[in-house]
Amino acid sequence: MFISFEGTEGVGKTTLIRKIHQHFEEQGKQVVLTREPGGTPLAEQIRSMLLAVNHDENMSHDTELLLIYAARAQHLQQVILPALESNKIVLSDRFTDASFAYQCSGRGLSQDKLQLLNQNFVSRMPEVTFWLDAPIELGMNRARERGALDRFEQEKLSFFTKVREGYETLWKVEPERIKRLDATQSPDQVFEQALQYLA
């Protein structure tokens, strides 16, 4: 089983992933915990490039998208697909839905570009995607409490409003796969919401 976790900054994805990871391990299941961009040494190097705040050169939106898919291709081939073939459960902090929300809805890139990349480089989609939804201001306040903000976290509220709208669009198009969780609730309550879809 392949499960991805989506949402804007500071909505509690990491906490939920840890709880679900523990839940499956207590059932004696083998679980692979991973993230995007990242998940392999090479993909983590790309992640560092994507998140770094560079005051000397602005990264173009196309470059950002291509770097994310370079990391994703490596991640799929090296981690996700081998784990699924070994009947392990894969829990991924973000996957392709993040690219639609952040790069298409947030940055304004063409969906055709994303579709082309998905057709050529994404051979497997998650069976379940949890979208943790909370007001943008709440998530950003949580993100600021964690410390220094990365390149994405430094974006304006208007950007994250578009990102959230992107997630909402996907949820309405694919309600069978994408499950919206109310991330304004406590971590335990969010976990209980998620378990209902995994029963």
From Swiss-Prot:
Q: Name a biological process GO annotation.
A: dTTP biosynthetic process
Residue positions annotated to bind ATP are 7-14
Q: List the disulfide bonds.
A: none
ATP-binding in keyword set: yes
Stated family: Belongs to the thymidylate kinase family.
What the protein does? Phosphorylation of dTMP to form dTDP in both de novo and salvage pathways of dTTP synthesis.
Q: What is this protein called?
A: Thymidylate kinase
